[in-house]
């Protein structure tokens, strides 16, 4: 998969275009994305989110996939528009939640919008956690740990500082991970974590 060959179905394309237009109209009253990325939203946000789709684990009955700090809906809403049906978009900001609900309505996405902080989510309820441009890897692991099932995974796209974040996180956690090169930036990687546990400082 590469940036030049990435494509969507006609229906997905239409819904994603509606979604992008909605972001631009709401951006005037709610800060959804960086202003400098508005003109390059398709590559910078949509494709950057969509590339996660084939990295997600199979849907597990009775469990969900949390998008923590969903903000404007990247990556979760894009993945839902592409057909993923177990997503819960978690966003603590009420105005951003209002936007997400409107985007869900306009695109008819099969997704749950929850105005909630990650710390308040039910334990052991997710088979995967995703997050994009939310917090450091170490903080994301701290938030994700109680939410995941035993075989749950974390999928976190990270930018130019991915290596620094990973090294810092490894001071606090034993991490079983693999890297997938981002198709939207040569300096970025997607960190897929299949298993992790806190390092016991008492040892």
Identify the role of each PLM range.
Residues 23, 79, 158:
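Residue-level signal for inorganic ion chemistry
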Residues 50-131:
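Conserved SAM/SAH cofactor-binding pocket of Class I
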Residues 96-98, 137, 162:
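Short alpha-helix immediately C-terminal to the canonical SAM-binding loop
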Residues 151-162:
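Conserved beta-strand signature within the Rossmann-like core of class I S-adenosyl-L-methionine
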């Amino acid at each position: 998969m590469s940036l030049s060959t990435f494509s969507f179905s006609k229906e997905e394309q239409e819904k994603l275009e509606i979604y992008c237009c909605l972001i631009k109209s709401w951006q005037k009253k709610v800060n959804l994305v960086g202003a400098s990325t508005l003109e390059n939203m398709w590559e910078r946000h949509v494709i950057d989110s969509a590339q996660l789709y084939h990295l997600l684990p199979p849907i597990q009955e009775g469990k969900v996939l949390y998008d923590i700090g969903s903000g404007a809906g990247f990556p979760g809403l894009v993945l839902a528009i592409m057909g993923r049906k177990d997503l819960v978009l978690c966003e603590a900001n009420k105005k951003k939640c209002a936007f997400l609900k409107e985007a869900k309505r306009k695109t008819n996405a099969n997704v749950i919008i929850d105005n909630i902080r990650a710390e308040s989510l039910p334990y052991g309820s997710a088979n995967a956690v995703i997050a994009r441009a939310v917090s450091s890897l170490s903080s994301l692991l701290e938030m994700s740990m109680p939410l995941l099932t035993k075989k749950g995974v974390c999928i976190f796209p990270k930018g130019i500082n991915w290596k620094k974040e990973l090294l810092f996180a490894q001071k606090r956690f034993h991490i079983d991970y693999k890297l997938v090169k981002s198709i939207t930036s040569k300096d970025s990687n997607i960190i897929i974590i299949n298993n992790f546990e806190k390092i016991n400082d008492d040892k």
